[in-house]
Each structure stands twice: as structure tokens, then as C-alpha cells.
Amino acid sequence: MSNMLEKARKYETEKIAATDPQTKPLFHVSAPTGWINDPNGFSFYDGQIHLFYQYHPYNREWGPMHWGHSVTCDMIQWEQLPAALAPDEEYDKAGCFSGSAIEADGKHVLVYTGVTRIKQPDGSEQDRQNQCIAFGDGKDYQKYDKNPVMTGEMLPEGCNRVDFRDPKIWKENDTYYMIVGNKNENQIGQVVLCSSKNLTDWKFETILASNESGKIGTMWECPDFFQLGSKRVLICSPQDMKAQKYEFHNGHNSVYFLGDYDEKTHTFVKELPHALDYGMDFYAPQTTELPDGRRIMIAWMKSWDACVIPNSQVWQGMMTLPRELELKDGKIWQTPVREIEKYHKNPCRYDHAEINQETTLCGIEGRTIDLTVLLEEDEFQTFSMKLAANKEYETSFTYHKAENMLEIDRTYCGVTKDVVCVRKLKISNPEGLKKMRFILDRQSIELFLNDGEQVATTAICTPLEAQKIYFYSDKKIHINVEKYGIVKL
């Protein structure tokens, strides 16, 4: 173990012991200390689900990237393991950037982007991003002594050799494949496909997909590629997108393409892109397939456009609740992993409750809850809910029936900087909004609309004493409400 990795492990152990768990999410992965962003290496190995992540343990800001490490058996209760990687080699001294993991010959293999800096003729330095591997046993990892295994110089002419990062690996038959985010010489985002027979000798295969229209941002970060039902799915997180109506917002997005893939010719014919999440805090998703066949996705529950936390908080960054993916009606539907139901306690239910003007319902409150609201067809035109609320704080969700539009507003959630606080989304179902399922976990609200046809994720900075939930309707409406507290076993 290098001195740098040993130092990081010692530091995080000391800081974790000094951190009050009440200041952190109850059932979401969060930074053990310092900063985390992209999920990495989401995989099943040796009977456990492993999640790594971009990690700077020493303060709350992005810095030289390490890989943090957590494991779980049910995706609700997570165990913190020691940091897995540190930027301690010449080829990754500027950071161990994002990547993925796979099991091979009994070993847990991490594939990541090592960043180094090359001196230029004018004396300046320029980043170089190359792909590297490390072999481990689920806790300790040894970097391959001939890293990097693939460099930008191995890409064909026309490919950018500076931005070449975030490998996602899988195996088909007897061949390993990885897709890597890239740009072409005109700064247009694309994903390249590479292959290997042995994990150490890689070659370029093809450009799997690119931003031909020029409308899907610039660099395509954190790509993922997998089968879901009858379709192949490409996920990526484009930088610097322009807003497109209510589907995509300005800045960093996470999108998916459905399509058909020919494994022999490595041709992916993609359909139109869709947003994966319509909230304000969702980026760099990564998926894995569990032994039971479920495709599970997790993402960074923050955004480069809105990284705001209270000054009193000594950590920065958390992940979404893992979500089950399903292909339905030509789109990806998402639902919270079913394991959350094992932690349901203290149920509270209302059937056909009448709402007219603003009101509360006894027992319907809390900050670690699973809350479902069914809207009945009624006279209303505007229906709204305020969560994590009291006289000073609130995060509101307002449905405008005539426009079939949902407006999310966290202006009064406790943020102290001028970041994105309002977002509108068009409800996909032409029959309107029928069902809302909220997952609250102290610093976050995840909203699953119409059984997961759309999802909106929002981080909040609200003090925990703001526990109330308010309901409002401009005219009479009847709702069914079901709330469970979430209590860890």
C-alpha cells in the first residue's frame, strides 16, 4: 500500500469517528468525509454489491481524485470500507477519475481513468487521460504494473486525446469491451468502443455513438451501455447543454438513448434522447445487473451547477437511492429498489381525504419517509405539496392541471447561494398526474411520478426540525395518502 493511500485511509477513519451520524442521510450513500461525486465501479462481487465513487477526503471541495468504497447486501444499509485507490502513480498523479468494475477469474477488477500532466513546449502542462486497471479482493486493490492499458494515442485521427475518460466495462462471450467518453476534434461529444481478450491489451473498435446534431452538449461523460428488455441502452452525461423545452435543462444533463445493437459489426442505431431525471440534482448515473436479473441504477445526487451545502456540514455529496430500471412503452421507467419496503415502519393512511385550501394531515410528516399520494379526478386546477416545511422552510411541488405541468421549487429550502432552485417538467402521461411517490432522507427528496414513468431528484439544505407536509388545492380534491417511516434495522 502506498503512503498516499495509507494516509487517506487513516484520515477518513479519524474523521468518520468524529462525525455525528444524525447530520448525514439515513439510508443513502454519502461522503464519509470531504467530497464525493460520480459513482464508480457499481458491481456485484463475492456476495455483496460494491459501490466506489470519486472522492477527495481532505476537504469539502473537489480535489485530487481518490476512489472511496462502500458495500451493501440490500442497497439500503451500507458499510463504509477503506478508500480503494489514491493518485499515487506517475500515470494517475493528477487523479484517479471515474470508471467501473467487473469480476474476472475470481478477482475484482477496477477500470478507471488515470490523469497525468504532460509538459508542453511553451512550459505549460496539459492533462492526459488514459485508461488503467487494478486487481483486488473486494477490499484492497493493486494497480497493474504496466498501466495505462489504453492511451489517447491509440485512438484514430479525429478523436480528442485530452478528453478520454470514464470507462464502463462488460464482457460478451470471450471478449471484454469498454466504452469511454470522448470528443472529436471539433469538440463534439462521442463514445468510443474498445475491446480486449485479457483485460490488459486493448484496441479501439469504433465510435459507438456521437452527437451528430450538436444539440446534446459537448463532452459525453460517464457512459454506460447495457441490454434492457428488447433494447440496448446508451446512457451518458453531456456537459454544457442548452435547454430544450422541458426535456433538458441548461448545463449538465444525464440522458439515455434506446436503440438496436449489432454485436458483430459493433453498430448501434440509436433513437431520440430522453432525460433520465427531471430534478435539479442527478448526474453521472451508473448501472449494474444483479444476480436476480434486475438492472439497478445509482447516480450522484448533486450537480456541478448547484453544489451548495450548509457551512456547518463537514461533508459534501451523496448518491441517489438505487433504482430498478424497466423498459415500458418505449421508455425507461424507474422505481426505488424494493428492498426499501423492508424498512417501512409506523404506517399512516388516509383514503379519500378532502383537500380544499392549505391543510395538514395528522401523522403525515417526517424527513425519513416513503410517501405515496394518489390524486382523484376532481374540480381542482392547481394542487401543491410543501415538504420539509415549517414557518421558515419548504420545498414545494405544484401541479398545474391545465398545462399538465409540475413545478418544483426549493427556493426556501435553506440554500444561501444563487443556484438553480426552480424547475418545470411536462408530465408524460397525457391523462395527467395521478400518482406521486416521495422518498425523503433528511437532505434529499426523490419524486417518482406515475409509478416511475418520470423521476425528479432534489437535494435540500433544510434543518431537520422542519418536518411538516402541507397540502393545497385551489378547489376541492380528494386524495389517498400512504406514509411509512423508514427505520434502519
Regions found by a protein language model. Give the residues of each.
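Beta-rich accessory regions
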Residues: 9-15, 254-489
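Beta-rich carbohydrate-recognition and catalytic domains
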Residues: 1-166, 171-216, 227-278, 301-350, ...
